Each structure stands twice: as C-alpha cells, then as structure tokens.
Amino acid sequence: MIHVAGSARSRVSILAPLHPGPQAMSDDMCHAGAMDSAHVDDVSARYADFARFEVRGRTPVYLAWARGIADDAATCELIAGLPRIKRQPVLVFAAARHAGSAETEDYDAFREFLHAHWAEVEQIVLTHSTQTNEAKRCAVLLPFLSMIPGPLSLVEVGASAGLCLYPDRYSYRFTLDGGATRELRPAELASSVTPTAAPVLDCDLRDGIPAPRRLPDVVHRGGVDLNPIDPADPDSRAWLRSLIWPGQQAERVPRLDAALDIAAADPPNIITGDLVEQVEAAVAACPAGSTPVVFHTAVLGYLEPPARLEFVRRVTRLCADAGAVWISVEGVTLLDEVAAQVPEAIRRNKGIFVVAVNGRPLATAHGHGDWVRALALD
C-alpha cells in the first residue's frame, strides 16, 4: 500500500489494493450533483450556480453571461424550451460562440445576439454535445495510473475524441509542495508524430500527492461515446475549440490541436453507443495480460440518475469479475458513496472534483487539470 507523505492529519492511501473492485454502491445513489439537484429544471438557479461555483474567477465572459441569464426571465424561458440535458450553460454558451457571438462581458450585447440568432444556436445545441476534451486532465490521472501494474488497457467512457487515452504520449511538468518541479517526457512518440508535438501539461501536486516517476505502459486505447469525435475532422476540431472557455484559448487551443494531432495519427478504438450499455464490450476488447482501467472525467453529470446508478453497478461488477480498475474524476456530489466519504466542507463546493479509485475518494482536483490535492479524511 502506498501512502501519501504529508501533514500529521490522517491522509487516505493514494492507492489501496485495487482488487477486488469498488465498494458496493447504495441502491438509492441517484440524486447527487449540480445536474440533478432539486432545481435542475430551474434555469435561473442553474445559471446562478454556474456563475457561483464554476466560472467565478476563471472566465469573466461566462460569468457575466451566466449572471445575466439568471436574472433574465425571458432568456430563461428561451433556454427552458430545450431538452433538460441540453440546457447546460457550457453547451448553450459554446453554441452561441460557434454561431458567431462576440466574447463580450456586455450581457446586453450577448442577449441581443442570442435572441436574434436563437434558431441557429438552438440547432447547434440540439446537434452537438458538451464533449470538452481537455488533455490536461491526464495530469490528474497520471499519479494514479502510474501506480497500477502494467501493461494497461485504457477504457474511457464518454471519450469524445479520446484525448485522455494518451497519457503516455504527453509531457508533464509537476510542481510539488515546496515549489520543486518534476518533469516527465515520453521516450518516443509514434513514428508519424514528431516529439515537439507533445504538449507539456503543467499541474500542481498538493498536500503530498507523489510525483509519478514513470509513464504508464499503455497497450490498448478504447472507450465508448454516443458520438465519437474524429480528431482529424476540421468541423469537429472547430467545435472542440468553441468549447474552450473565453480567455483560455491562448493556453488551451495549442494544447488541444497538438493532442488532436497525436490522436489522429494513432486513433483509439472508441465504440459508438451508450456508455452504460457498452462498457462491458469496451472492456472485453482489452487484450489478455493487460489490466483494464475504466475511467471518466466530468461525464456522469450528463447521465440521468437511473443510468448513472446502472453504470456504477456494471463497472463495479467489471472490477470484481474482470480485474478492472475504475478511476472516476467527477463533481463532488455525483456519486453518493464517494461523497459520503469526503468532508462536508468539500461536499458544499460544487465546483470541486473528486478523484476516486474503485469507489474510494483519494484526492480533489481542478476540473481542467491545473492541480490535484491529496484528500485528508477525519
């Protein structure tokens, strides 16, 4: 068992024995997460929460838009006409920008554009998904992946273009407690990709998260998505750029483009279908002699509660029967059994993500991979 060094407070082991599978999830695990709270159908409250918990201090443009919509009954009514799962602020805002909205903090100007171009925005919303594919989330996954004996078969559910399936192809610069840095680089990349194409992922490892000393030995890259994105398709690449938040393009667009190039040169095996129904098939495709690692980042909030419960049941069984390891990086309240194990102060912060291995919370993390912090349990 590997422990995190650090304070005198009792810290959870970063990697408890990974087999058998996750702790049993309760049958009533069906009501956590901002997507499923009591006011999920209240557009005003949903956008107010988005402003308060998700974008404050991160993107002034989206903060202004979300606050404006929260206080704008006519625009709330417009958005309420969308299917519930399509009312997500990130999706509506990305669709508006994709349709040509200026990235302005002037809410009145944004409102005028949104109402004037609603038919186009609505069509984009209905035909696209929030498939944010942030390769930097690999920096959050790597400390845990590097502790699993290889070789590994990675299975990402909700994979989008599959950019998080290449943790061994990226370079990393970790900042440790005290300010020291640790760098990791791939020994070699696919022959069709030059080493300079590997993006460098910066991440702070806080409160004793150990710096990975090696990149994982990945022998299979697979997954499931309702609408897998072709990393070589120009229109798909343009949509992924629209999903990047205003003010973050200078850092994230070059990283996205580099990661898409890596994926296009060595495409993953992503099954088109429902992640609940197809997770077993994705694991069955893993080669013998490898450890299947089923993982997901910021995905389960887009499932209805019964589907989320069924997914947990199935992945739990895969861990027990197929020797799989399950890594979840999700909003703090999305998995009841995970949320029950973290301090109340953390549960109150809807913007926090929790990293759990086999249903056991081990760390909190930034949603886009800026930092990961060892979880202190009382």
Regions found by a protein language model. Name each.
Residues 1-34:
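N-terminal amphipathic/basic-hydrophobic helices that include classical n-h-c signal peptides
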Residues 30-81:
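Non-catalytic accessory regions outside enzyme or core folds
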Residues 77-149:
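Class I SAM-dependent methyltransferase Rossmann-like catalytic core
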Residues 82, 101-102, 132, 149-156, ...:
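Class I S-adenosyl-L-methionine-dependent methyltransferase module
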Residues 292-305:
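A short SAM/SAH-binding and catalytic strip from SAM-dependent methyltransferases
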Residues 310-321:
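A short glycine-rich, Lys/Arg-flanked "PGG" loop and its adjoining helix->strand segment in the class I
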Residues 322-330:
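Conserved beta-strand signature within the Rossmann-like core of class I S-adenosyl-L-methionine
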Residues 334-378:
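C-terminal region signature
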